């Protein structure tokens, strides 16, 4: 048996590596090949290309690398034609993976989407594409299963793979104690894992840090960098700010554990912050032109999610009855766990306001921690990789579905997985 993986994000590489290990534990004779990153390679995947090096954001960056993406899609198509795998597993990275799914369906290869793109948030009309191109949707979030099933997609909730990693993670406790034992409260700054995110977010976080420092002179700051190039860029910015900020590479879990509170880029890191129950302010910054575009077309885009942050979605009803307003300020204490700002402007004063309150009023920090503890008890369970691996192999080995439906047939023609298979 052979399974082809297509993964483009660093976080997807992590989850793909864990899933591959579980698949090979159950059946060591399976060949795992495809596109991914170093963690998938170390788990036993024969990489055709390190796709994580092309993890880009924004239309401009996509256009710059368009030829590279097209060559990789064509290469996958040739592989499907000459070495037909038994299944294709996609993780995140929708812009590229839709094309991989289309090629797989053209060759009648079953497609599994593990860690589906959040189309329910930003592009609900794309569920038609999901229905045509994907045979099995493995959902990370509890409300996703119902959302996809209501739209005639084969979907089952397996849990979020991020919690698998967090439960198995071993922290450097000596490093944590060393950081914590220095004088003054500690705020961790998490600007993101992509270069564009770091460049967009860090300047606003440092501006907020300056405001916090003026109110709480003993406060210290640490920046968690995903890679050395990010740390070098951050260090240049920090030197200009004249703030007490240290930068570390590959120490995100320890820095989160050691901090009193954090400011972070919107993304899956919010689940790690939930796991460690850290009060956090979330920034989702977008360029002005993109902000104007989204705001202008919001009615057409049916942009009805109430929040941008996963933890806030898990804490409340994720979908709004009316359109979500961009740039809204969540200043009501206790309304949501993580105050969030979706903006193209400067929200550093608002970000600082929350951090100052948490530092000056421990009871507010404790109230937020209790709220996070309650959410964690409900959703932060491991086992997603196990469930996903078992589901995929049961379908391929023990409960094979009918031949995959060509992508050009309508939703009424798509075969539904037997209920027994969905509940296993």
Each predicted region: which residue ranges?
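Nucleotide-activated sugar donor-binding and catalytic core shared by glycosyltransferases
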Residues: 1-424
């Amino acid at each position: 048996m052979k399974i082809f993986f297509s993964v483009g994000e660093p976080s997807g590489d992590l989850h793909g590596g864990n899933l591959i290990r579980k698949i090979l534990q159950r059946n060591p004779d399976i060949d795992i090949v495809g596109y991914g990153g170093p963690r998938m390679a170390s788990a036993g995947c024969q990489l055709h290309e390190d796709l994580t090096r092309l993890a880009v954001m924004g239309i401009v960056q996509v256009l710059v690398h368009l030829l590279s993406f097209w060559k990789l899609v064509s290469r996958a198509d040739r592989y499907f034609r000459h070495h037909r795998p038994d299944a294709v597993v996609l993780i995140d990275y929708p812009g590229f993976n839709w094309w991989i799914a289309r090629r797989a369906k053209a060759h009648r290869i079953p497609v599994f989407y593990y860690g589906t793109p959040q189309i329910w948030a930003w592009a609900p009309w794309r569920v038609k594409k999901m229905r045509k191109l994907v045979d099995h949707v493995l959902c990370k979030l509890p409300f996703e299963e119902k959302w996809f099933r209501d739209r005639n997609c084969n979907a089952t909730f397996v849990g979020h793979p991020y919690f698998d990693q967090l439960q198995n993670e071993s922290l450097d406790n000596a490093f944590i104690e060393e950081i914590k034992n220095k004088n003054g409260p500690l705020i961790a700054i998490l600007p993101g894992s992509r270069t564009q995110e770091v460049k967009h977010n860090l300047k606003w976080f440092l501006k907020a840090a300056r405001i916090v420092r003026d109110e709480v002179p003993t406060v210290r700051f640490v920046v968690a960098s995903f890679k050395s190039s990010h740390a070098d860029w951050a260090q240049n910015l920090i030197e200009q700010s004249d703030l007490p900020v240290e930068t570390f590479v590959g120490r995100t879990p320890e820095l989160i554990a050691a901090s009193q509170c954090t400011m972070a880029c919107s993304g899956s890191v919010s689940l790690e912050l939930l796991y460690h129950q850290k009060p956090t302010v979330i920034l989702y910054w977008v360029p002005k032109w993109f902000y104007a575009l989204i705001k202008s077309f919001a009615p057409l885009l049916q942009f009805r999610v109430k929040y941008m942050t996963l933890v806030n979605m898990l804490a409340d009803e994720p979908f709004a009855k009316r359109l979500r307003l961009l740039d809204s300020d969540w200043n009501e204490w206790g309304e949501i766990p993580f105050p969030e700002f979706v903006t193209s402007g400067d929200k550093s004063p608002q970000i600082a306001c929350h951090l100052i309150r948490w530092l000056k009023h421990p009871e507010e920090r404790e109230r937020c921690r209790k709220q996070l503890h309650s959410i964690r008890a409900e959703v932060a369970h491991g086992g997603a990789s196990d469930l996903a691996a078992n589901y995929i192999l049961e379908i391929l080995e023990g409960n094979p579905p009918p031949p995959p439906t060509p992508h050009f047939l309508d939703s009424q023609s798509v075969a539904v997985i037997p209920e027994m298979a969905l509940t296993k």
